[in-house]
Each structure stands twice: as C-alpha cells, then as structure tokens.
C-alpha cells in the first residue's frame, strides 16, 4: 500500500494542500487538492498503446457532486445527470492549457477526471481542479511537458487580487482566469467592465507571477513522488515518403492555397490531394491503407507548412489580405417581422443571424448548481448547424464548443445590459451561425448588439468582437487580425477580444505552442483594438441607438410599487386574488419581496386595467374621504358597500339618513351605487361609513327632538375575563 504524502503551501491567504498516495491508486496519477474547505480529487489515466487516427485523444471531465454543497439533486431520479453548463465550461478551461503541452504526434488516449467532493464558496473548485489535473499528470508516467497552474484575478479600486472571494468579485471590474507554465501564458479567459488593454495585460502578468510560484511548488512534489515517464511511440512520417510526397505536391499546394475564395480554395487543395493519393493507389501497394493514411497526413502537413510560410515570410494571407486587414463587413436589422429584435452580421464568409427576445422577469433562468441559487435574466445561446460549413450530419444537442461560444458572447455583452430597474425584462439572445469561415463566435457578438438595438434594449454601448491569430516560426512571429478558418486551424493562436469603444468586455485566448511572451500579448491586444473600433464604426452606421419603441409583439412591462405588507392582499388566499386579475386581464404579474410589482402584456390597455385593480386592492381608506361604491350585501343592521376592489365598509342603518329608517331596503338595494363618507376605521381595520353625513339635515320642531344614544356599528371585541 502506498503511503500518503501531503504537500502544503499558502494560496491567496488560504491553506493549499496536495495529498498523493492514498486515493485512486490504480490511475496513472492522482491528487487530492484541499483548498480551504474545497476538496477536489483529480485522476489521470493514459492508455498503453496509441489509438488509430491523426489526432490526440485527450478527454477532460469535471464532475460536480451535489453532496459537496449539502444538496440533493432535483428531478425524479435524485442523482446527478448530464453536466451543467458551468461544469462543461470548466472542463474546457482545464483542457485548454494542458493540451498544448503534449508532444506533437502523441496518439495515446489520456483521460483526466476531476471530482468535486466539497465546496467552500470562497475557494474555487475550478482552480483546484486545474491544479489537480497538472499534479496528476506530472507525477504520473504519462509524458507531459508541464507543470501548469491557473489562477483567478480580480481588480478592486485599481488593486489586483488573486482568487477573489465572492464578496470581492462583486466589487471587481475584471474577472480573469489565466493559466500557463513557469515560462509563459498559454490560456486566458476574461470578462471586464470596459477596461483598457494596459489594465488587462497587467492583470494577466500579475496572475502569471502566482502561476510561477505554483509551478515551483509542483516541482517539489515531482521531486518527491514523481514517476519515471514511460516511452511513448510518437507518430512520425517516413522521411523518404515525406520527401517523395513533398516533391510531387509542394508547388501545386502553394498555388492552391493562394486561391482567395474559401470554397474554391478548398476545392483546389482537395484536387491536389486527390491527385497524389490516386497516384499511390495506382501502385497497388501491399499495405495500401496504411500508406494512404500516412500520405494524407503528409499532405495536410504540407498544406499547413505552406500556409504558415506564406504568412510568415511573404506576409500574404490565403485570401490576399494584409496581416491587419478585416474582411468586408455588412449588416442589417429588422429582418424578421414577428420577433422582438433581429440583426444579421456578415464578415467575409462568416455570417450570424442574432435574435433578441424580451420576456417578463419571471422567465429568468434559475441556476441551482454548486454555488448559491442564481437567477439569470440575460442569456446568450449560440448554434452552429453543419450547413454553415457545407457539411452533413446528425443535429444533436449543443456540444461543448457551442456552450463555450455562447458563454463567451454572454460575457462580452453582460456588462452593457441595463439594470433590472432601468429595463425590467428577461433578455434572451440566440445567435444562429448561417455561414462560417472563422470567428463565428465574434460575429455572434456583433449580431447580438444589432439585435438588441433593434429590439429597443437601452444597452450602455455597442459591443464588437474580433478574433486574432498568430504564426510563429522560431523567433519570428506574425499577428493576424480577423482570422479565417484555415488560419485558425493551422495557426498558433486563437485570441478573441470583444469590447466597446471604451474598453474590453471579454477576452479568450487559446494557443497551440508552449506559451506567449508579454510582448506578443501586448501587440495582439493593440492590434485587436484597431480592428474592434473599425467594426464598431460599421455597426453604428447600421443602427446607432436603441429603437425608441419596443416591437408591437414584445410584452410591455409596467412597474408599480406597493407596501410589502400589502403583497398578501394582492395575492389573496391561495393565490385567488392574483389569479383572478390574470384571468380578467390576461397579463403576467411578478411581485418582488420589496413590493415591486411587474405587469406584462402586449396589450397596454390590459396593463393599465391590471394596474387599476391592484391600486384599488392596496388603496387605503382615509377618515373623511368620500367614495362612490356599490352595495354588495344587506343585513338588518346596515349595508356593506364596496368602496374599491377588495375594500368594503359598513353603512349602519342609523347612518343612512337623518330621519329614522325602518328597513335598510327602504333606502338602498343590492347593486345600488351610493356615495358615502368614511367616518371611522377601527383598531381592527373595519371601515364605518355614513350616507347621511353627505345629506342636508332637515330642521325638526323642538318638541320632536329626542336624545340619541351613541352607536357603535361594529361590535367591539371583548377581552377574555381572567378567572
């Protein structure tokens, strides 16, 4: 049995311990991370033999357990089901800095699983899982060029903070996750409140200093318990075959890559590949399938090398653009007549149609995960159908990529969404990618800005996004603006930056090399700003301000404030009162605990009617006020008059007229309208009314006057007698 070993350090003011040797001993490597009261187990397993195919089969799983926060899962089965969006995004977050650190040609399957056992809300389980993934790999026998680490960075009043608490995060204007090795940054994910490029770069470099310390900490663990790395057979092409294929195809491939239009370029490249493959099929080789697979791989590498050489040496891109040139832009709003807002954004051969839907606040999304229960009134969803790239295949539920791109767009736009008080609506954006040749996630951000302006959402400022690329050969590097699909596929970086004219609102960086220096990051951010401002200028030329009026098909929401103690009156016993209002008017009603009432309907007349009913219900009678109401009930001692919805008062028989009244029915009948004056509201809230107080008193002869006894119209409640 392996002996448990514990390694500890301090991390953002909390104790961080890494335990190895006790749990998950059959995995290639495993580590239990304790960070504050957060506990995460990460296990890594690598297959002994390579898998067929021309890609690296790495799988990262992040499993949230509801028991970690003392909750029982909902639903009929009462057990964890499909991963939440947050779990999916965390798995992507861990995958991205780890993947570049496996050798090229590595084909053995690697699976990393992080299981959340306990959650301290101020100690991020995501960052613990990222650290655990690195530790599990570096102490295993799986060849991995780590360690890596990741940290969260915030900025409060100009001061940068590592792993901010929930309270600190609410005050922060930057929400950044950065990961990398001791030497360089290789993954960034950020949201921000329109911060400058300089502030974002400083936040990244501030985080890298803490990453260095965590990498040094892991080196101590490796020295104590690290296993010797196993020998792995890397996929390497046969040198003679490679030279042969290169000689036959290089010139033709170079010419094909320079074809500017995407579909024509793809066809030209495919023609070159088919010609070479057919020539090998004609040889009728004994191991034909294996040779053809290797030739196909060599041809793809030639395509990659030629594109990179063209950009790096000639500074020419496959479509003929300069390195900082943006593709042609076009946009349109109001395409769809019955939706609340729509925007079509096209950049080259990438096109996104975004649709904005407005709904009452009650239709917000409830997120019941490992954190506190959250209510989300702004959502952005991204769909990527296969026809957008001219392919066929089954249409499945949104995958990791679609969830990730939707979340990136949401993060980019959320800082310009008006507050609930300014605009009391739930806002859902859906971006449909209709055509894609790179940067579709950023096109969805631009389309969503157009859709919200078209819908009349008073956003603080328009937001645009741009994807930057990089080709690095040795010390020479070229930064590309507005990358297309081929440049993304064969390039070294996908660096997405979104923001307003005043600053960055979202940033995401993935790279395929070991890491990036501060200089490259700085230049990429500066070049991205130029591109973003160019795109924003185009967007505002299409629509510069939110529409003054909402769509005729959007719900109109009116806000009313009532006293919190009156909420029960509006709702009524068992919801009877509020349901009656909804049935009568067809509106939707939401009531907050502070007494804010939201009334929503496409019909403004019905909104006003519902408001009038509620105002009547919560209206308070005042002594001395005069009302006209209807007689709702008659008793021997008087008539009950409805002053307004939900409020009745009693006109005692003696208050009907100055003269003596024998029967109530002699003066009033059921359903009669009568004007009365409030003469008393007793300690139980009962209202006493008078009709005669509004009538002229007839003079009586002195002899006819009789002293009148004082009358109490509602019987007083007696206190129980003490025995």
From Swiss-Prot:
GO terms for cellular component: cytosol. Residues 692-723 are annotated as: Disordered. Its main location: cytoplasm. Pfam families: KH_1 (PF00013), PNPase (PF03726), RNase_PH (PF01138), RNase_PH_C (PF03725), S1 (PF00575). InterPro entries: ExoRNase_PH_dom1, ExoRNase_PH_dom2, ExoRNase_PH_dom2_sf, KH_dom, KH_dom_type_1, KH_dom_type_1_sf, NA-bd_OB-fold, PNPase. Mg(2+) binds at residues 488, 494. Its cofactor is Mg(2+). It is found in: Cytoplasm. Residues 624-692 form the S1 motif domain. Belongs to the polyribonucleotide nucleotidyltransferase family. PANTHER family: POLYRIBONUCLEOTIDE NUCLEOTIDYLTRANSFERASE, POLYRIBONUCLEOTIDE NUCLEOTIDYLTRANSFERASE 1, MITOCHONDRIAL. This is Polyribonucleotide nucleotidyltransferase. It comes from Listeria innocua serovar 6a (strain ATCC BAA-680 / CLIP 11262). The lineage of its organism: Bacteria, Bacillati, Bacillota, Bacilli, Bacillales. The gene is pnp.
């Amino acid at each position: 049995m392996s002996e448990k070993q514990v390694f500890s350090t301090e991390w953002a003011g909390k104790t961080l311990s890494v335990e190895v040797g006790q749990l998950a001993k059959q995995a290639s490597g495993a580590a239990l991370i304790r960070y504050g009261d957060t506990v995460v187990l990460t296990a890594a397993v690598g297959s002994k033999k390579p898998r067929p195919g021309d890609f690296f089969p790495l799988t990262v799983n992040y499993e949230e357990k509801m028991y970690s926060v003392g909750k029982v899962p909902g639903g009929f089965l009462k057990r964890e089901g499909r991963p939440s969006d947050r779990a999916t995004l965390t798995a992507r977050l861990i995958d991205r800095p780890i993947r570049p650190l496996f050798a090229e040609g590595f084909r053995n399957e690697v699976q990393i699983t992080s299981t959340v056992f306990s959650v301290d809300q101020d100690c991020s389980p995501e960052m613990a899982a990222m650290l655990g993934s690195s530790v599990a790999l570096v102490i295993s026998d799986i060849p991995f060029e780590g360690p890596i680490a990741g940290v969260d960075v915030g900025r409060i009043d100009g001061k940068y903070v590592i792993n901010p608490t929930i309270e600190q995060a609410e005050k922060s204007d930057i929400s950044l996750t950065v990961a990398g090795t001791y030497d360089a940054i290789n993954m960034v994910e950020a949201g921000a409140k329109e911060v400058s490029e300089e502030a974002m770069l400083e936040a990244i470099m501030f985080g890298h200093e803490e990453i260095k310390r965590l990498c040094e900490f892991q080196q101590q663990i490796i020295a104590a318990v690290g296993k010797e790395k196993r020998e792995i057979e890397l996929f390497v092409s046969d040198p003679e075959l490679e030279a042969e294929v290169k000689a036959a195809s290089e010139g033709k491939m170079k010419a094909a890559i320079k074809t500017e239009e995407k579909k024509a370029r793809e066809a030209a490249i495919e023609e070159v590949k088919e010609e070479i493959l057919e020539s090998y099929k004609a040889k009728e080789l004994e191991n034909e399938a294996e040779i053809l697979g290797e030739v196909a791989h060599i041809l793809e590498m030639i395509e990659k090398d030629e594109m990179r050489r063209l950009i790096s040496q000639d500074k020419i891109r496959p479509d003929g653009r300069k390195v900082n040139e943006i593709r042609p832009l076009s946009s349109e709003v109001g395409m769809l007549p019955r939706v609340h807002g729509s925007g079509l954004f096209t950049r080259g051969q990438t096109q996104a149609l975004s649709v904005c839907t407005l709904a009452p606040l009650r239709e917000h999304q409830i997120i019941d995960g490992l954190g506190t229960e959250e209510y989300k009134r702004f959502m952005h969803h991204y769909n990527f159908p296969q026809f957008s790239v001219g392919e066929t295949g089954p249409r499945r539920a949104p995958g990791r990529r679609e969830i990730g791109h939707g979340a990136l767009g949401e993060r980019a736009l959320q800082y310009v969404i008006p507050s609930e008080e300014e605009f009391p609506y739930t806002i859902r954006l859906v971006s449909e990618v209709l055509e894609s040749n790179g940067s579709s996630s950023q096109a969805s951000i631009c389309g969503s800005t157009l859709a919200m302006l078209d819908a009349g959402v008073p956003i603080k400022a328009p937001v645009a996004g741009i994807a930057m690329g990089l080709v690095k050969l040795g010390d020479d590097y070229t930064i590309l603006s507005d990358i297309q699909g081929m440049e993304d596929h064969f390039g070294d970086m996908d660096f997405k930056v979104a923001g307003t004219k005043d600053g960055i609102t979202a940033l995401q960086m993935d790279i395929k090399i070991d890491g990036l220096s501060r200089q490259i990051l700085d230049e990429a951010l500066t070049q991205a700003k130029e591109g973003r401002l160019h795109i924003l200028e185009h967007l505002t030329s299409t629509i510069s301000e939110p529409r003054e009026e909402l769509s005729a098909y959007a719900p109109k929401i009116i806000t009313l404030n009532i006293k919190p103690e009156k909420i029960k009156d509006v709702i009524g016993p068992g919801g009877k009162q509020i349901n009656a209002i909804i049935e009568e008017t067809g509106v939707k009603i939401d009531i907050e605990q502070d007494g804010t009432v939201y009334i929503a309907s496409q019909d403004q007349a019905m909104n006003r009617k519902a408001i009038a009913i509620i105002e009547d219900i919560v209206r308070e009678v005042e002594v001395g006020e005069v009302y006209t109401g209807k007689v709702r009930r008659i008793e021997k001692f008087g008539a009950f008059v409805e002053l307004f919805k939900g409020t009745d008062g009693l006109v005692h028989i003696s208050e009907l007229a100055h003269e003596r009244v024998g029967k109530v029915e002699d003066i009033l009948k059921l359903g009669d309208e009568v004007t009365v004056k409030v003469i008393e509201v007793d300690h139980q809230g009962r209202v006493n009314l008078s009709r005669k107080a509004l009538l002229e008193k007839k003079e009586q002869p002195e002899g006819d006057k009789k002293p009148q006894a004082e009358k109490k119209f509602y019987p007083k409640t007696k206190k129980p007698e003490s025995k």
